């Protein structure tokens, strides 16, 4: 019973993140690494990845290198060097209750902008 409840909470977090990311203009959802990793792109560039096979919700976002270091120092257990990514430009964010929803959205928005969201797709 408790296990089912924890799975439900996990899925709610994933769905909330997914809904937020998909609410951003021109976002494409893909699964290039298999069904256990959702990858979101803007203008063909990845800016948000979330694994579906972890006990805790965690996701990767692009980040300005200087800001990435600051965040890792400020939140050492919630903001880690990007897992399987260029650690200078990517952070792994652990959704463990330390970071607020506002902070999570700011990190997603920053990544979205870094991936080139301000430029429209050429048609």
Cite the ranges covered by each PLM segment.
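Charge-dense, helix-prone N-terminal extensions
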Residues: 2-123
């Amino acid at each position: 019973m408790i296990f089912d409840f924890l799975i439900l909470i996990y899925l709610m977090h994933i769905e909330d993140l997914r809904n937020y990311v998909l609410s951003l203009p021109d976002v494409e959802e893909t699964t290039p690494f298999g069904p256990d990793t959702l990858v979101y792109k803007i203008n063909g560039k990845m800016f948000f990845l979330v694994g579906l096979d972890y006990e805790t919700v965690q996701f990767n976002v692009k980040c300005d290198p200087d800001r990435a270091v600051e965040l890792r120092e400020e939140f050492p257990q919630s903001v880690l060097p990007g897992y399987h990514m260029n650690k200078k430009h990517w952070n792994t964010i652990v959704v463990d209750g330390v970071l607020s929803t506002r902070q999570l959205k700011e990190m997603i928005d920053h990544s979205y902008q870094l991936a080139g969201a301000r430029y429209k797709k050429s048609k």
